Structures are given as structure tokens and as C-alpha cells.
Amino acid sequence: MDKFLSSAPVLLTAMMVFTAGLLIEFNRFFPDLLFHP
């Protein structure tokens, strides 16, 4: 359980970076889908 607790922030950061990169790539290919009224 200690190994999981020590690796949790790393996994959380990796997921945040992955999600941000995915949003940026999606916004680059489909710029009008994220900002439609």
C-alpha cells in the first residue's frame, strides 16, 4: 500500500498531462467543437 501511495501523485500528474495534451491535440484538429455557443 505504501508503494501505491507514493506513486499516486505521479500517476495523477501523468493523467493530467495526458488529458491536457489530448485536449490540445483535439483543439488543434477540431477547433470549432470546443467553443461552439
Swiss-Prot record:
Mind telling me which GO cellular component terms the entry cites?
A: photosystem I; plasma membrane-derived thylakoid membrane
Matching InterPro entries: PSI_PsaJ (IPR002615), PSI_PsaJ_sf (IPR036062)
GO BP annotations, alphabetical order: photosynthesis
Mind telling me which Pfam families this protein's record contains?
PSI_PsaJ (PF01701)
The family note in this entry says: Belongs to the PsaJ family.
What keywords tag this UniProt record? Answer: Membrane, Photosynthesis, Photosystem I, Thylakoid, Transmembrane, Transmembrane helix
Keyword Transmembrane helix assigned: yes
PANTHER family per record: PHOTOSYSTEM I REACTION CENTER SUBUNIT IX (PTHR36082:SF2), PTHR36082
Compartments where located: Cellular thylakoid membrane
Q: What's the stated role of this polypeptide?
A: May help in the organization of the PsaE and PsaF subunits.
What is the protein name for this chain? Photosystem I reaction center subunit IX
Topology relative to the lipid bilayer, per the entry, is: Single-pass membrane protein
What residue ranges are annotated as transmembrane?
4-24
SUPFAM superfamilies, from UniProt? Subunit IX of photosystem I reaction centre, PsaJ
Q: Which gene holds the coding sequence for this protein?
A: psaJ
